[in-house]
């Protein structure tokens, strides 16, 4: 029997070092991981055997067995699943480049509970064996192949792979040589309790040998939890299934267990977590909803089973209408799967709308966790945008609480027909923005958008239920006309523009190409000035984001709006009427101040500093 000694992949070494020197209190998770892996191996073979029945010839009843040998200090876990050949053993146990190990290491928080769950989420669960074992021996024979291979390691940097001539049927056997200090895991009663706690939802029967090692006792019902009636399932069973499936430490916030018996037959058991998932916005995040066909696991990768914006969902979907021998490629553009996806989306959004109305405080917590992802759907062409907007909530500047668009509309002032918003990074800064002072002074609410995605979806959704959605930075906002559209008001507005032409022309001449236009503001009440953009122009924050991403080269010139009721602007205007045009420095300072308030760069910081110093000096002398 030839042996081949190999070094672990560098990233595996880091994981092993973490496991071997683990201080985690919940070391029993090694059993959860090994049972889960064994179940997956059986699921894979069950799927492959649909198109090649010879793979399971003579042994089509899948099972997992667990045995304790106290005398040898061993725990043995055996399955008759897909098995592994030499290449599989090296790829799956010697390297884990596919498992996102670097991301796993970065995500470690030092919180033992959270870190324990990360082990499974990143696919490095096998290595948790080294928390309790000082040597691990894996014997395996791949379905459809004759050769038996053994993988063995003490976890200290190297492993051995060898071919074996021992009699061994299809599947995998893992022998854990338990550390002396962890020998409590050899206690028959304790291990049986651990296995049972992690096996109730597993669809493969799990057998536990008695202390004599002769008789097998089945520990689980081996029926998929989602196939049972809701009345037969306890809340604790739902929780345990959720935690095992998603490697979570929280309880599910919402559980959706439904059987669809219409034109398309399928069962869904879906969960919405109560805590934010660590990889929600990670580029190589995994989907956490598994597709089954007639209780046979098919895939949880590269299938369009749920929309991306609902990626926080956890659970399973089991279809009766898809053929078992369907290829993963065929699932990409499958009409049945598309109908299932639409039905699930409708069901989830319906449940969210119900929760929003019945439990607003709970919903606020959900929104803080997953609202950013949910709003991504508003940028997708295939989304029912109105249905999705119905479950969105935003911070109200007027009431300082989260409200829906429907609640905003219900609070319209007489004659108001527009939904106003202001976007930025910090809600407190937005509240003090001059852009909204006039609207708020008239008790006209403004929604505060602080997620980056907000700047994208408002470009796709310009209205909601017939009401325009408009940024408060737009030049055409007139707080006096927002609630009244009389011709008399329009005439007054035109008269105001003409009256202050001397003022606006002076600002434009002084600032030149720094501004596109200078206008008299219809929305400022106390601030001297603010930047604004026309309806056709890009929102200020959106433009800044695209510049940061190097999508556009430079910022465009903005409009400058002046408040003629402000004392500073009034002084400049009076000076102009007296033919005094010596306020260029003050004009530039007002413009720089408006830029700073919008987060825009000041054109010349040195000149700005000098102007500011000169004005302060004049004030104190």
UniProtKB/Swiss-Prot annotation:
It is found in: Cytoplasm. Residues 545-621 are annotated as: C. Homodimer. Residues 1-328 are annotated as: A. This is Chaperone protein HtpG. It comes from Rickettsia felis (strain ATCC VR-1525 / URRWXCal2) (Rickettsia azadi). Belongs to the heat shock protein 90 family. Residues 329-544 are annotated as: B. It comes from the Bacteria. The gene is htpG. GO terms for cellular component: cytoplasm.
């Amino acid at each position: 029997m030839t042996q081949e000694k190999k070094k672990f992949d560098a990233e595996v070494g880091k994981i092993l070092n973490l496991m071997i020197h683990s201080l985690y209190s919940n070391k029993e998770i090694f059993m959860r991981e090994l049972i889960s892996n064994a179940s997956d191996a059986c699921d894979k073979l069950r799927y492959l055997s649909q198109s090649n029945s010879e793979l399971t010839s003579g042994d089509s009843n899948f099972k997992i067995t667990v045995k304790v040998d106290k005398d040898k200090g061993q725990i043995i876990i055996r399955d008759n699943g897909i098995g592994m050949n030499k290449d599989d053993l090296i790829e799956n146990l010697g390297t884990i480049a596919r498992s996102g190990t670097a991301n796993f290491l970065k995500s470690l928080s030092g919180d033992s509970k959270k870190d324990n769950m990360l082990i499974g989420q990143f696919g490095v669960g096998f290595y948790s064996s080294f928390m309790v074992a000082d040597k691990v021996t894996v014997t395996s024979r791949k379905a459809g192949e004759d050769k038996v291979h053994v993988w063995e390691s003490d976890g200290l940097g190297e492993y051995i792979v060898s071919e074996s001539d021992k009699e061994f049927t299809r599947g995998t056997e893992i022998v854990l040589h338990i550390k002396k200090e962890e020998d409590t895991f050899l206690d028959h009663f304790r291990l049986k309790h651990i296995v049972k706690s992690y096996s109730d939802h597993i669809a493969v029967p799990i057998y536990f040998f008695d202390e004599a090692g002769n008789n097998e006792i089945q520990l689980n019902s081996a029926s998929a939890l989602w196939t049972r009636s809701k009345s037969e399932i306890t809340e604790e069973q739902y929780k345990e299934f959720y935690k095992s499936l998603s490697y979570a430490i929280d309880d599910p916030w919402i559980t959706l267990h439904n059987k669809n018996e219409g034109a398309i037959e399928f069962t869904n058991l879906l969960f919405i977590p109560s805590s934010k998932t660590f990889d929600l916005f990670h580029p190589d995040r995994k989907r956490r909803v598994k597709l089954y066909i007639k209780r046979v696991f098919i895939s949880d990768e590269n299938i369009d089973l749920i929309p991306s914006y609902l990626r926080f969902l956890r659970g399973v979907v089991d279809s009766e209408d898809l053929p078992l021998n369907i290829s993963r490629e065929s699932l990409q553009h499958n009409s049945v799967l598309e109908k299932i996806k639409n039905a699930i989306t409708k069901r989830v959004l319906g449940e969210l709308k119900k929760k929003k109305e019945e439990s607003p405080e709970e919903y606020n917590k959900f929104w803080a966790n997953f609202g950013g992802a949910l709003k991504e759907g508003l940028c997708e062409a295939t989304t029912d945008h109105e249905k999705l907007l119905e479950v969105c909530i935003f911070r109200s500047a007027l009431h300082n609480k989260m409200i829906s668009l429907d609640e905003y509309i219900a609070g319209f002032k007489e004659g108001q027909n527009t939904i106003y918003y202001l976007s930025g990074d910090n809600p407190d800064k937005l509240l003090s923005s001059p852009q909204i002072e006039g609207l708020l002074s008239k008790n006209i609410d403004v929604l505060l958008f602080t997620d980056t995605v907000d700047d994208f979806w408002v470009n796709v959704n310009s209205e909601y239920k017939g009401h325009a959605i408009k940024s408060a930075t737009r030049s055409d906002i007139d707080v006096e006309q927002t609630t009244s559209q009389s011709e008399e008001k329009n005439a007054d507005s035109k008269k105001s523009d003409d009256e202050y032409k001397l003022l606006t022309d002076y600002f434009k001449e002084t600032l030149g190409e720094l501004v596109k236009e200078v206008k008299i503001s219809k929305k400022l009440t106390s601030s001297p000035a603010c930047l604004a953009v026309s309806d056709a122009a890009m929102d200020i924050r959106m433009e800044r984001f695209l510049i940061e991403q190097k999508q556009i080269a430079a910022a465009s010139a903005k409009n400058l709006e002046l408040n003629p009721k402000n004392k500073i602007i009034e002084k400049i205007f009076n000076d102009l009427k007296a033919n005094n045009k010596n306020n260029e420095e003050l004009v530039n300072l007002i413009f720089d101040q408006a830029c700073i308030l919008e987060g825009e760069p000041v054109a010349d910081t040195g000149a700005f500093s000098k102007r500011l110093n000169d004005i302060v000096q004049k004030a104190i002398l």
